[in-house]
Amino acid sequence: MTTVFQTMPTFLAGLNIANFGAATSQFPKLESEITAPRQSMSTAFQKMPTFTSVISVPSIAAIAPQMPSVKPEKGVIGQCLICGEPSTGKHYGIVACLGCKTFFRRAVVQRQDTECKREKPCDVTTMARKACRACRYRKCLESGMSKEALQPRRDLIGCRRIRSRPSCSTSTPTPPRPQVEDKSQYLTLLENLTTIDDRLRKKKLEVVASRQAAVDLAVLAKQGCMSITDTSGPSTSRYVPGGTSPNGGDHKMMVMLGTDISVSTQSELLMMLEWTRTLPVFASLPVQDRSVILKRFAVHCLILEHGYYTAQANIDDVWLITNGTCMPRNVEKLEEGCKISVSADRRWRQEKLYKQMTDCCIDEVATPLRNLKLSPQEIVVIKIIVLFNCGCSSDYSEITEASRRIVLTFRNKVVSALFAYYESVGLQNYAERFGNLVLMLSGVSSAASSMLEAYQVMRLFKITPFDPLSQELLFNI
């Protein structure tokens, strides 16, 4: 302790503090008192000089002039003439607060309703100004706010900087818009695809009609009726030529049997294979990728072809296949001649096994297609979209990345060709129509799942004798 107080004068000398002599003269006396007994310790501290006597602290008055002056806040210039809240300026011609200024601008720009629902004028004060927008807007006008003071071109979300465009002499040429040659190429591509699809569809219907005629001849041969006039009747009773609605009175709707499903499925899938070979990019894909795409597209192809055929036939509450037979939504609502030909076993299967598939196909596919009235160009584009969407998703590792890029590029090209076709025929709101086509694809997928499940039941219980090609494409067997 003695050493500490001995060194303190030296420390204070470096500080150059006033009254240093008076402070240091008392340190020897303090040293003797500190060495006294502990009972005199309190006396020693009482005799120590105070801090203010050792160090002189400048007064606050001396410091105050050196502090920077703070400007007072800008005062209000008056109360808002509308609600009475303090205001700091004039807005749209009168003294108004920021709240009433913003309200008036939004009411004018957005053309909000200005009709009061009460009989008496509402109170427009600071606490109740939001109760009635009509009365508040009316008071704004009565107080002197002017609509002409608004800047109508001001953006609601703030000012936008308009970048100055360089002069034509120094600017680089902008990318040209698609030329007429590109549009003509798109139209030519779509025309070729549509022609091939129509030709194969007609060929398929002719094959189905020939097969059905052969079956009818075989039935008549068993019955001993070989006249040509008699053979024409049964053929027209099951086949609807060209997919149009039958107008003849001799037409009789028939419920499809297992053999009808088998023959129709085989014909559809054979035409599908022939159709895909005509696509420009499909032949360039690896065999494994083509196999995956075809297996996933097979049931969707049946849905699209049968749905397009049903929509053209214009018959309600039935699902038709290409040989003219149908799956009815309700067997009891069929004509008497058709209802009598349905066996009890077939009626039970229709109500218990095929009911869900029939309803889904009619509601999700046939009815939307009939309402949209698809053109031949649209149906071929829809088929290509579904074909290249089956198997080319990133979820399926079987498809190589190179094949996925190829098919997606071609799919986008076909969609652009459809847009060019819409423009060429002068269709209004074709973007909306294409959106409706795309929205329909979810129903196609749902109906495809229901059909595949029903066909699995038919195969499992040997109701329908599917050929090896159909089993490989549909069931991957």
Swiss-Prot record:
Q: Does the keyword Metal-binding apply?
A: yes
Q: Which Gene Ontology cellular-component terms appear in the entry?
A: nucleus
Domain of life of the native organism: Eukaryota
Say where the protein is mainly found.
nucleus
Q: Which Gene3D superfamilies would you find in this protein's record? A: Erythroid Transcription Factor GATA-1, subunit A, Retinoid X Receptor
Q: Does the keyword tRNA-binding apply?
A: no
Q: Where are the zinc fingers (NR C4-type)?
A: 80-100, 116-140
Q: Per its UniProt record, what CDD domains does this chain match?
A: NR_DBD_HNF4A, NR_LBD
- State the SUPFAM superfamilies in the record: Glucocorticoid receptor-like (DNA-binding domain), Nuclear receptor ligand-binding domain
Q: Which UniProt keywords apply?
A: DNA-binding, Metal-binding, Nucleus, Receptor, Transcription, Transcription regulation, Zinc, Zinc-finger
The record's listing under Pfam families reads: Hormone_recep, zf-C4
Indicate the segments forming the NR LBD domain, all copies. 216-477
InterPro entries in the cross-refs: HNF4-like_DBD, NHR-like_dom_sf, Nucl_hrmn_rcpt_lig-bd, Nuclear_hrmn_rcpt, Znf_hrmn_rcpt, Znf_NHR/GATA
Which residue ranges carry the DNA-binding annotation?
77-152
Write out the annotated subcellular location.
Answer: Nucleus
Q: Extract the GO molecular function terms from the UniProt entry.
A: DNA-binding transcription factor activity; RNA polymerase II cis-regulatory region sequence-specific DNA binding; zinc ion binding
* Purpose: Orphan nuclear receptor.
Family as reported in the entry's similarity comment: Belongs to the nuclear hormone receptor family.
Q: What is this protein called?
A: Nuclear hormone receptor family member nhr-19
UniProt organism field: Caenorhabditis elegans
